Amino acid sequence: MKIVLASKSPRRRELLSNLGLDFEVIESNVEEFSSEKHPSRYVMDLSFNKAMSVAKKLKEEAIVIGADTIVVIEDKVLGKPKDRDEAFIMLKNLQGRVHTVYTGITIVRTKDFKYVSDFEETKVWIKKLEDEEIFNYIDTGEGYDKAGAYAIQGVGALIVEKIEGDYFNVVGLPISKLFDILKREFDVRLL
């Protein structure tokens, strides 16, 4: 069955490619807005909007995967930084503390529009850093298109002290949960 990733995220693309999956990417282009207040419901709502918007456009039978990731610290949602100063403030706020990364995933089968939404959460601790180290990391440029202003799979690995939970969730797609839902709910087997 055709698999479609409803995301422009290069990291999600890379994760699915690393699994050896044959898939197509179709960006959803939906507004990233949800009235949901709880982080898990918020990311599931956004992932649903992305997946369903792409599923409705398809003429052929497919499985559509939508995802959305946010970083939360003390009930404050951190999105992608707008500039260097905002990236510095985010990383300064995250250092020496624990935050939670939430990723919502929604899988839609276009044949009957059956869908399943779920989420994963992972705790991440960022090391205490000198201001110069924070600016040096920001100047790598890799954190600008990522929630929380860092990329655990890149140079950002140097600033992460430890994680508790699914590493791939922090990258942007909880692979194990995706595998389980595809198998259990849609009889799509990746192995």
Swiss-Prot record:
Q: Name one GO biological process term.
A: nucleotide metabolic process
- GO cellular component entries: cytoplasm
Give compartment(s): Cytoplasm
Enzyme class (EC, first level): hydrolase
Cofactor(s) this protein requires? a divalent metal cation
Principal cellular location given in the protein's record = cytoplasm
Asked whether the keyword Transmembrane is assigned, the reply is no
Record site: Important for substrate specificity: R11, T69, Q153
Active site feature = D68
| MF terms in GO | dTTP diphosphatase activity; UTP diphosphatase activity
Give the EC number(s) listed in the UniProt record.
3.6.1.9
Q: Which InterPro entries match?
A: ITPase-like_fam (IPR029001), Maf-like (IPR003697)
| Alphabetical UniProt keywords | Cytoplasm, Hydrolase, Nucleotide metabolism
Q: Which Pfam families match?
A: Maf
Described function: Nucleoside triphosphate pyrophosphatase that hydrolyzes dTTP and UTP. May have a dual role in cell division arrest and in preventing the incorporation of modified nucleotides into cellular nucleic acids.
Family that this chain belongs to = Belongs to the Maf family. YhdE subfamily.
Q: What is this protein called in UniProt?
A: dTTP/UTP pyrophosphatase
